[in-house]
Amino acid sequence: LEQQKEGILEARKEPLKLGMLALMAGNPDSAAEFFKPFLAEEAEPQIRNNLMMALANSYLAQGFAEQAASYYGTVIGLPEKGRHYPLALFSLGKAFELLGEIQKRDVVWRELEVNFSEHPLTFQAQLSQK
């Protein structure tokens, strides 16, 4: 039984490894395919949130603001507001900015300011708005 359990764990690691390689190679679409089982609602929340942030960051870095906004929005909408929440708010604002949606950016950054008034990303957002 223990060997069987180890085999299952090893099999689950493979798509994670391949997905991370795809991310490092600059291919978030391929990474998202490998990550599908880990992005499901019933997946372990910390892994799911980390992978969604990694995908969102990769999309944003490559200028795919719409895809990035989708992942950031999902992270923000999750019931468990973890350590990614301030970065997701800030980055969603950046994605909206790239899309030319300045009013949406300002709404998201206002939420960042209200909930995390002393966070460094709040100060960065305030500077970006000037």
Each language-model region and where it sits:
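Short solvent-exposed coil/turn linkers within tandem alpha-helical repeat scaffolds
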Residues: 6-8, 39-47, 76-84, 113-125
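Acidic, proline-/serine-/threonine-rich low-complexity intrinsically disordered segments
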Residues: 1-25, 32-34
